[in-house]
Amino acid sequence: MRLNVGLIGKGKWGTILKSKLTEIANLKFVLGKNKNYFDFILANKLSWVFIATPNNTHFELVKNCLNLKVNVFCEKPLTINYLEAKKLIKIAKKNKVKLYVSDVYSFHNKKPKKILLKNRIIRSKKSNMNDNEFFYRFMYHDISILFNFLKKYNIKSVSFKKFIKKKIYKTNIQFKN
């Protein structure tokens, strides 16, 4: 039996998710982030809502779906704020629903591992994006890959700074030890 699912987000990742969801589920609707999705969710008795909208919209969308007692798959990052992420986890537990954050690149680490074993300095080039896009969409993958190799060192925080007319970013990873 195929599950009834809905998709909020019509951008690049929304389009990718749509093509996959139509193959494996009953995709009941695809909405932009500004549509009133409450009625669609309630009318279609959904098992899951997939969210692929801009990062700054994730918290409210996910929170509202969880409060409707619907399982949520959210494209990363879950939120742009740690405390908001903790709130969403608490809401999911309270409502006994599942909350999943896409993290597919964490499982493809053979090549990065070879690079890490050879090099002490790792450079990652990204261009044509604003600060939030850079950090939350692209650096996320770099940090996620690094985390797989550095987790035994207890990471305390990750931050970034922009330099040279906003074209170069420096990322700092601070360890507890």
Identify the residue ranges that each predicted region occupies.
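N-terminal Rossmann-like dinucleotide-binding module
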Residues: M1-N34
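Rossmann-like dinucleotide-binding domain that binds NAD(P)(H)
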Residues: K125-N177
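A contiguous active-site-proximal alpha/beta segment in oxidoreductase catalytic domains
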Residues: T79-N132, D142
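Histidine-centered divalent metal-coordination motifs
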Residues: L17, H58, H141
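Beta-strand-loop-alpha-helix segment that lines the small-molecule cofactor/substrate pocket
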Residues: W48, P54-N55, F59-D103
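Conserved acidic residues
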Residues: K28, S47, R120
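Short amphipathic alpha-helix with an adjacent loop that forms part of the alpha/beta core around
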Residues: Y37-K45, K113-K114
